[in-house]
Amino acid sequence: MSKPTTIAVLQKCKQEKKRFATITAYDYSFAKLFADEGINVMLVGDSLGMTIQGHDSTLPVTVEDIAYHTRAVRRGAPNCLLLSDLPFMAYATPEQAFENAAIVMRAGANMVKIEGGAWLVDTVKMLTERAVPVCGHLGLTPQSVNIFGGYKIQGRGDAGQILLDDALALEAAGAQLLVLECVPVELAKRVTEALSIPVIGIGAGNVTDGQILVMHDAFGITGGHIPKFAKNFLAEAGDMRAAVRQYMAEVESGVYPGEEHSFH
């Protein structure tokens, strides 16, 4: 039986400059498939609002939804490092964040992911002091879609320094991982090098410590708009298991994401 994957394993990957692949998972069967093929880090993302529930954003997702899918994924991948999103309006105050984090941690998560910058410092401190590990999320944060006016690249120009400052503030508050979404490669490189914690990219080029993809994008079953950073690994591989292996291999070698998947 394989040993449980911990944050220390990812920290070692960063130190040794070994890229690692992660993926979203929402149910037992796919979680088991991913674990069987060697993916040791999974995210129960609020992306399930769009991919599973059919909404046009992540905003309708509830804490109960996340807990339900977390339990299913944990059964399929008992030894993976499992991140679970706290959904929209589930962490508006530190106290609310702690209450909802407790629900998803009891459901099987190892860590909670929250979207936002320096305003979350007190929340991150409160959670980590109470043994709830935190993954930050900067750049394009889908829960803020109504503020951004759509799904747009973040961190260009002066906004890049603000994002870097936010990343450093989250790390100082105790965050142990950071997801960077849809930012220029140059900024992703600066952030990854400035932080001592592992940085996982999606639409941030191949310069981050790890990569994450929504599983539906990796299998080409997105429907409608296909994000620039996505790649259909199933098209070349022929079956799902081979597609997962190809995704991992291309991330680890730095082939994916390529220039065609990146922003500047």
UniProtKB/Swiss-Prot annotation:
Per its record, the protein catalyses: 3-methyl-2-oxobutanoate + (6R)-5,10-methylene-5,6,7,8-tetrahydrofolate + H2O = 2-dehydropantoate + (6S)-5,6,7,8-tetrahydrofolate
Q: Where in the cell is it found?
A: Cytoplasm
EC number(s): the record gives 2.1.2.11
List the active site.
E181 (proton acceptor)
Q: Where does Mg(2+) bind?
A: D46, D85, E115
**Major site of localization recorded for this protein:** cytoplasm
State the source organism's domain of life: Bacteria
Coiled coil spans: none
What cofactor does its activity depend on?
Mg(2+)
Pathway(s) where this gene product acts: Cofactor biosynthesis; (R)-pantothenate biosynthesis; (R)-pantoate from 3-methyl-2-oxobutanoate: step 1/2
Function according to Swiss-Prot or TrEMBL: Catalyzes the reversible reaction in which hydroxymethyl group from 5,10-methylenetetrahydrofolate is transferred onto alpha-ketoisovalerate to form ketopantoate.
| Self-association and partners | Homodecamer; pentamer of dimers.
Q: What is this protein called?
A: 3-methyl-2-oxobutanoate hydroxymethyltransferase
Per the UniProt entry, what species is this protein from, by scientific name? Answer: Salmonella typhi
| Gene that specifies this protein | panB
